[in-house]
């Protein structure tokens, strides 16, 4: 009898599981039908229907989405809306699975239980429903609940209806408090973030862009660094989400933030000195001279103490370098935490328009940061970008007062101690155009890349591509590239500056006006008939075609 009773229990249990499986199968089948009927970009049904999709669906584990050939034209049209593959994004679950891309040593790290709480501030303007909500769900699903104080969504005057009441209704159902704050008029990223920070309540503010995906274990290492030192500002490794396929690709832990001559943020290899400081342990945070600006965490009170953002800046652009300089020069630390990974959709073009034009806004913002933080080195930037000096940059007295109040260090200290491998040469003999006496043409990098030939073109006096520096190391430099000659008669190419002299060593004679390549013993010459857009290098003759005028060659060295 006992055996028979036992069998009945087993059969009954099995029947329950079979019925449950059938119910779930029917449930998700109906859910998928609902999604097929819903308006593009808008959810249908309740939260469970929206979020739960089988994990073998499109884009799961970060795999690329393939659009069928018959939908390619529609895909291209939809792409224009947000400048990423909106069709692919809408095919992917809002809580899609992602690979764990952390270093193995990161996966076993143990963090304190009493980490500070954070408010996650996300600014959006006409963002796609799928990318915005995927950002929100990734924060909720991959963060310890007790560490998330709230999520603050700041709407920078979006015009799309589904980002109004439907969004507010949706986020009310989530298990984490989500507040939607509306800007009364288009204000830009900087002021919208300031609004979000002002209403936040967490001990830490974490800023994210509206098209991100957080991965497993992303938050704890960020908060742990701030708990260790509240003056530490931390960024995750920014992984790449393809704007074409939404494939998730791990970012490198061997790059950090810098900037070029035009004050554009750039990624550069982590230098050996930083590897030595960490004793080769790649799981330790990297001290970075600058941050990309889209994703970072900062102690809420410290954010106020160091002056938040410069509210005199407009929309977007330059604010990331401004806050980076300020953090370092005023006693803080800026790190990339290599055990934290957050994906970001990198677009090739922006879908947004800016009042007054993008260039005018960025010039104003860069002028403000240069005037407040770069001391005498601002003149280097102005020679590169003379148009910046023509913009009205507003009143900076409060920012200069902040610098005095915080007793911040000079920019020369920053270059020497934080960013000694900066592309700005600290010692140089000339900066500006290099003009050929005979042809009246100037050297021009033509916006070409490494390993390409340097160009020569009519002088335009607008800086930019025609600015070269003859450095104290006797290099002819354009940003991080130096003129290099590896064989007799050229060509003259642009290679990464290595500071080892050799093929990048040039001797300028201020009397003869010649630029002699020391290794080949030949002189820089005008272009030839065979190639009229590149300078040549030939045996030195002293002819006018080998004479060059270096702009500002009498400038004293900057120390």
UniProtKB/Swiss-Prot annotation:
One Pfam family from the record: Glycos_transf_2
Pathway: Protein modification; protein glycosylation
EC number: 2.4.1.41
Annotated tissue distribution: Widely expressed at high level. Higher expression in kidney, heart, small intestine and cervix and to a lesser extent in all the other tissues tested.
Parts of the chain on the Cytoplasmic side: 1-9
Keywords assigned by UniProt, alphabetized: Disulfide bond, Glycoprotein, Glycosyltransferase, Golgi apparatus, Lectin, Manganese, Membrane, Metal-binding, Secreted, Signal-anchor, Transferase, Transmembrane, Transmembrane helix
Tagged with keyword Thylakoid: no
Effect of residue 464 to A: Induces a slight decrease in activity
Phenotype for residue 322 to Q: Loss of enzyme activity
Disulphide bridges, residue numbers: 106-339, 330-408, 442-459, 482-497, 523-540
Cofactor(s) listed: Mn(2+)
Phenotype when changing residue 125 to Q: Induces a strong decrease in activity
Positions of Mn(2+) binding: 209, 211, 344
Documented effect of changing residue 156 to Q: Loss of enzyme activity
Transmembrane segments: 10-28
Binding locations of substrate: 156, 186, 316, 347, 352
Lineage: superkingdom: Eukaryota
Lumenal topological intervals: 29-559
Region described as Catalytic subdomain A: 115-225
InterPro entries per record: GalNAc-T, Glyco_trans_2-like, Nucleotide-diphossugar_trans, Ricin_B-like_lectins, Ricin_B_lectin
GO BP field: protein O-linked glycosylation; protein O-linked glycosylation via serine; protein O-linked glycosylation via threonine
Domains as described in the record: There are two conserved domains in the glycosyltransferase region: the N-terminal domain (domain A, also called GT1 motif), which is probably involved in manganese coordination and substrate binding and the C-terminal domain (domain B, also called Gal/GalNAc-T motif), which is probably involved in catalytic reaction and UDP-Gal binding.
Functional description taken from the UniProt entry: Catalyzes the initial reaction in O-linked oligosaccharide biosynthesis, the transfer of an N-acetyl-D-galactosamine residue to a serine or threonine residue on the protein receptor. Has a broad spectrum of substrates such as apomucin-, MUC5AC-, MUC1- and MUC2-derived peptides.
Name recorded for this polypeptide: Polypeptide N-acetylgalactosaminyltransferase 1
